[in-house]
Structure formats: C-alpha cells, structure tokens
C-alpha cells in the first residue's frame, strides 16, 4: 500500500552529497577517534556503498564499537566540546554538533547481537570523506541487518545487495557464527535473496543451504512444544499484542536485561556535566 508523506530513498550508485557542516563533523569525529586509538569501524551508508556500490543519503555516520570503546569515545569527544548522549545503554549513543550527529552502535537494539572486539579486528582499511579509517567487513555488515525487519524499516534489500555484489565471496562460517541461535533470521534473508536473484542462488554455497534447510526441517518435523515466542525480538510494536494482551513471552525485555556490557558514561564526565548544569 502506498502512503503519502516523505519520499523514501531510491537506490542508485550515485554518491550523495553532504552538507559542509555535516561532512566536517564526520571528519572531525573520525580523526579524533583514530588519533586517540579508539577501536571502531564505520558502518551504515558508507559501508554499504563500499561493499555494494549502492548509494544512500547519509543522515548520520554509523560507527560500530564495543560498549567499552563507546564509553572511551564519549569521554574523548565530550572533552573536545561535542555534545554527547547515551540514548539507550544497551546499544546506542549519539554525538552532536549543530544539526548533525554521529551514532555509536554497540549492537542490535534487541540485544540479540552484540559488537565484540572481533568485529573491529576484522574491519577493513579504507578512506571515508578523505580520512583514512576502517570499515565494517561485509560479514558483520550483513549480520547487523538481520534483525532490521520492522514495519517502518527493512534492510532485506541491503543483505541481498551484499551477497549479490560480493558474488557470495564471503566467510560463510563467520556469518553462521554471527547468526548463532538466530539462524532462522539468516535463512529468511537468504530465501529472500534467492527469490530476488534466482539465477544467482549459487552465490550462497550449497553446504550453507543444506545446513540451514536441514535444521529447519528438523525443527518442523520435531516441534518443541516448550519453544518460546520470539516476536518481540523481531518487532516489539507489531507483536505488542502478543505480549501485553495474549500473555506470550517477552524475550526482548529478557535479552536486554541480560546484556552483559552496556554503554556506561564515565563517572567523572557525569560529575562534570552535573557541575555545569
């Protein structure tokens, strides 16, 4: 169904221009983090362009890093005059200057997937906006999009483009490891890829198809009556009725509560901010 309102971006290989102040913010943040040896990797629109040549308007700069590195980065940037905010300690902080911002992302909002040091170690050297930096590897970029399947935003096309653009030359063992217990989300993305690009289904290696489909068939043939409802991990709003009215499991709250490492604002920074208030 077509909804009137703000036009959605149309895919293209054309690189989108940034506002001059926006570009300077991104460059300054990248340089400061690099100069202070904060381990991170660029993701989002810049990583997608790097790996697929698909251009997209960059409303922000996505930086992936561990929770510990995020706290260090916030400390460094706040001391340099940037306005910093921990929006959700489970996964998101923001760095602002004027009307523009940078996102620090430490995992998925549902806490099903968390950025670890291995994500950063596997990042690839590149140049973003003239600044030498590192960009998320395609395997981690793909994994970061598996749960972006909400009604208002869906990254299935990005996953399909990653597989298509790389011709499937990916570390599939790594992708399977990243998916872990959520392998069915990966399988659903691969089935969509096969539907979109039927002539390129071989880009996903046959052993990967076999492993995932066999696991699915085993689950179907031997269903677990105690298996828990997982809808809230997919879209907490669309499946709110299941949790709030029908009494089904709220795995989202459980996952978020069990998140081992949240973004913690440095204590001395909190004191500085309170003293300035």
Put a short name on every predicted segment.
Residues 58-60, 82, 103-104, 121, ...:
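Short, hinge-like loop/turn segments at secondary-structure boundaries
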Residues 2-9, 114-277:
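Catalytic cores of NTP-dependent nucleotidyl/adenyl transfer enzymes across multiple folds
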Residues 27-61, 65-74, 135-137, 242-277:
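Active-site nucleotide-donor binding segment shared across nucleotidyl transfer reactions
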Residues 17-19, 62, 113:
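Short, flexible loop segments at the rims of nucleotide/cofactor-binding pockets, characterized by
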Residues 34, 78, 127:
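Anion (oxyanion) recognition and catalysis
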Residues 79-118:
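Conserved catalytic core of two-metal-ion nucleotidyltransferases
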Residues 52-53, 96, 182:
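Short Asp/Glu-rich motifs
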Residues 1-42:
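Helical scaffold of the NTase/Pol beta-like nucleotidyltransferase catalytic core
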């Amino acid at each position: 169904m077509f909804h009137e309102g703000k036009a959605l971006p149309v895919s293209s290989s054309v690189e989108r221009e940034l506002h001059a102040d926006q570009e300077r913010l991104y460059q300054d943040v990248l340089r400061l983090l690099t100069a202070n040896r904060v381990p991170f990797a660029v993701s989002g629109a810049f990583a997608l362009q790097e790996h697929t040549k698909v251009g997209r308007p960059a409303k922000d700069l996505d930086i992936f890093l561990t929770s510990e590195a995020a706290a260090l980065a916030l400390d460094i940037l706040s001391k340099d005059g940037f306005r910093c905010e921990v929006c959700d300690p489970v996964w998101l902080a923001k760095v602002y200057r004027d009307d523009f911002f940078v996102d620090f992302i430490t995992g998925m909002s549902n806490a099903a997937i968390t950025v670890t040091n291995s994500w950063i170690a596997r990042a690839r050297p590149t140049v973003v906006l003239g600044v030498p930096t590192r960009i998320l590897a395609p395997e981690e970029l793909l994994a970061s999009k598996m749960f972006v399947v909400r009604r208002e935003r869906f990254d299935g096309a990005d996953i399909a483009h990653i597989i298509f653009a790389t011709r499937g030359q990916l570390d599939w063992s790594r992708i399977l490891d990243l998916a872990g217990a959520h392998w069915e989300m990966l399988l659903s993305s691969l089935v969509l890829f096969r539907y979109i690009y039927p002539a390129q289904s071989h880009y996903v290696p046959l052993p990967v198809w076999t492993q995932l489909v066999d696991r699915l068939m085993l689950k179907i043939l031997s269903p677990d009556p105690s298996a828990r409802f997982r809808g809230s991990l997919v879209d907490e709003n669309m499946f709110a009725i299941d949790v709030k009215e029908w009494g089904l499991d709220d795995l989202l709250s459980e996952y978020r509560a069990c998140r081992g490492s949240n973004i913690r604002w440095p204590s001395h920074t909190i004191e500085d901010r309170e003293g300035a208030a």
